[in-house]
Amino acid sequence: MPLNKESKQAVVAEVAAQVAKAQTVVLAEYRGIAVGDLTKLRAKAREQQVYLRVLKNTLARRAVEGTPFAPLAEQMTGPLIYGISEDAIAAAKVVNDFGKTNDKLIIKAGSYEGKVMDKAGVQALANIPSREELLSKLLYVMQAPVSGFARALAALAEKKQGEETAA
């Protein structure tokens, strides 16, 4: 069903609002993917706070005009699904992970910090650990010396207690 002018303007405004707050935009070709699989992809995207939408390319081009993602307009050809996220790696991770299990989803391009990336760039971005993963690793590294010191003190106290009991 064709969209009327007001509907198109509403779609462009909605997508432009998402793009304005985004750090990353990923484009992927979805030709031949079953509806059930696309539903799973959308559910995974929602979990990760990724705005995922199939758009007409002309509407997407209008939505990215005047933004750091404008250079992506050249890549907007064919049936594309757009992943947009405020998190730097979430969109790339969701699309890349789904692409590993479904070979019909083909990453075309992406943009991060105003730079256009090819498929390899999007995959490299997706392989970076998330902020939460990095923070948990940092916390572990910071806690390791403290917990080791605490265990050493406990062992020393236990040893002294054993000596006092034996004496």
Curated annotation (Swiss-Prot):
GO terms for molecular function: large ribosomal subunit rRNA binding. Keywords: Ribonucleoprotein, Ribosomal protein, RNA-binding, rRNA-binding. Pfam families: Ribosomal_L10. GO terms for biological process: translation. InterPro entries: Ribosomal_uL10 (IPR001790), Ribosomal_uL10-like_sf (IPR043141), Ribosomal_uL10_bac (IPR022973), Ribosomal_uL10_bac_type (IPR047865). GO terms for cellular component: ribonucleoprotein complex; ribosome. Forms part of the ribosomal stalk, playing a central role in the interaction of the ribosome with GTP-bound translation factors. PANTHER family: 39S RIBOSOMAL PROTEIN L10, MITOCHONDRIAL (PTHR11560). Part of the ribosomal stalk of the 50S ribosomal subunit. The N-terminus interacts with L11 and the large rRNA to form the base of the stalk. The C-terminus forms an elongated spine to which L12 dimers bind in a sequential fashion forming a multimeric L10(L12)X complex. Belongs to the universal ribosomal protein uL10 family. This is Large ribosomal subunit protein uL10. It comes from Paraburkholderia xenovorans (strain LB400). The gene is rplJ.
